[in-house]
Amino acid sequence: MASKIGTAGNRSGTTGMPSFISQIPVSNPMGTEANNTNTSRMSDFGVLEQYLGFRIGDGANVNRSPLFNSTSATNPAVGFEVSGTINRTLAPSNTSLPTATPRSQTMLLQSNLVSASGTHHENWGESNMADSGSRTDTSTDMDGDDKNQLIEAGQSSDKSKEKVLDQKTLRRLAQNREAARKSRLRKKAYVQQLENSRLKLSQLEQDLQRARQQGKYISNIADQSNGVGANGPLAFDAEYSRWLEEHNKHINELRTAVNAHASDPELRSIVNNVTAHFDEVFRVKGNAAKADVFHVLSGMWKTPAERCFMWIGGFRPSELLKLLVNQLEPLTEQQLAGIYNLQQSSHQAEDALSQGMEALQQSLAETLANGSPAPEGSSGDVANYMGQMAMAMGKLGTLEGFLRQADNLRQQTLQQMHRVLTTRQSARALLAINEYFSRLRALSSLWLARPREQLV
C-alpha cells in the first residue's frame, strides 16, 4: 500500500511539481497581502501532497533543482525545524523502525520540499514586498526629496522674497528717515526765518517808535517855544520882522542921542537897550532853531544880499570887527590891542565852528550813502532805511548846537566890544553895524527891483 502510494506520489510529484513550480511567479507586484495568500495556498498543496505521498527519488530530483537548492541553502534553519517537527509527528504512526525510517525520510524530504517551496514562496513574497517596498520607499523617498527640494526651494524663494521685502522695507525706512530729517531741517529753517523776521519787525517797530517820539519831541518843542507856534518858520519870520522894526526904533533913538550929544549916563542907557535888543533876536533864533534849524541856517528870513554874507545863521564876528576898526578911529593903543585880540579869538572860534560844520556835513553824507542795498520792498530794506534815518536824525540834532554856539560867539563879541570901547564909541559902533546891514537890505531891494531887461 505504501509502495503504491509512493509510486503514485512519485508520479504525481514527478509530473505535478514542474507544473507547480513553473506556475509560481518570480516577482509578485501585488504586495504583501498577495504573497501571504499564495503562501497559504501553497501550504495547502503541501499538506495534500503529504497525504498522497512522494518517492525519495522525487525528493532527490527536487533537490537537484537550482531553485530549491538556493532556497534550502538560504534557509537551512527553517527546513531543519520543519523536518524535525514532521518526524516527531509521523514517527508514532509506524509499527516498525526500519519501515518507519524510509517513510520518515520520505516525509522528511516531502516536508523539506513543501517547507522549501513554502519558504521559497515566502521568500519570494518577502522579496516582492521588499522590491515593492523599496520601489515604494524609493518613490516615496524620491517624492519626499522632491517635496523637500520643493519645500527648500519654496523656503529659499520665501527667504529671497523676505530678503527682497526686507531690503525694500529697509530702503523705504531709510527714505522715510531721510524725508523726516529733511522735513525737520525745513521746519527748523522756517522757524529760524520766522524768528529773524520777528526780530526785524521788532527792530523796525522800535525804530518807528523812536522816530515817532523824536517827531513828537520836536513838535512839543515847537509848541512850547516862545514866539514860535506850530508854523515855526512863518512865526519866526513874523517875529523877526517885529524885532527889526523895534531895532530900527532903538537905532533912531540912539542916533538922536548921539547927534544931540546926550550925557554919558543917558547914552549908556540907550546903548544898553540896543544891546539887550540884540540879545532878544538871539533868543528868538534859538527857539526857531528848535522848530526848524534848516530855516534859520538857510537865512530865508533875511534879504538875498544878507544871505550872501551869512555864516551859520548870522554875521561873522571877525568880519564885523574888521569893519568897525576903521569906523571907530581914533582909538588908543590899548583899545586897538583889545580889538585885535578880540578879532583873533573870534576868528579862531569861527574856524573851529566851520570845521565842525564841515565834519558834520561829511559824516551826514556818509551815513546816508553807506547803506547796504537790499531787495526792494523787503523787511531788510525798510530796517536799513529806518536805521539810516535814525542816525541822520541824531546827527542833525547837532546842527542846532552849532547854530547856538555861533550866536553865542556873536553875542559875546558884541559884549566884549562894549567893554573895550567907551560909551560914545559903543554907540557909534552900534550905529555903524546897523548902517552896514541897512545897506545890504537896500542892495537886495534894488536888486529885486532892477529892470527885467537886464535879466536876459
From Swiss-Prot:
Entries under InterPro entries matching the protein? bZIP, bZIP_sf, TGA_domain
- Domain bZIP per the UniProt entry, residue ranges: 166-229
**Compositional bias ranges of the Basic and acidic residues kind:** 158-169
Q: Where is the composition biased (Polar residues)?
A: 9-41, 125-141
Q: Which GO terms describe its cellular component?
A: nucleus
Which cell locations does it reside in?
A: Nucleus
Could you identify this protein by its name? TGACG-sequence-specific DNA-binding protein TGA-2.1
According to the record's subunit comment, the protein's assembly and interactions are: Can form heterodimer with TGA2.2.
Protein's job: Transcriptional activator that binds specifically to the DNA sequence 5'-TGACG-3'. Recognizes ocs elements like the as-1 motif of the cauliflower mosaic virus 35S promoter. Binding to the as-1-like cis elements mediate auxin- and salicylic acid-inducible transcription.
What's an example GO BP annotation here? Answer: DNA-templated transcription
- What residue spans carry the region label Disordered? 1-41, 115-170
> Could you tell me which residues belong to the region Basic motif?
168-188
What protein family does this chain belong to?
Belongs to the bZIP family.
Q: Domain named DOG1: which ranges?
A: 233-450
Q: Would I find Nucleus among this entry's keywords?
A: yes
PROSITE patterns from the xrefs?
Answer: BZIP, BZIP_BASIC, DOG1
Supply the Pfam families for this chain.
bZIP_1, DOG1
Q: Which stretches are annotated as coiled coil?
A: 167-220
Q: Which UniProt keywords apply?
A: Activator, Coiled coil, DNA-binding, Nucleus, Transcription, Transcription regulation
Any GO molecular function? sequence-specific DNA binding
* Location (main, coarse): nucleus
Q: Which organism is it from?
A: Nicotiana tabacum
Region feature Leucine-zipper, mapped onto this chain: 194-208
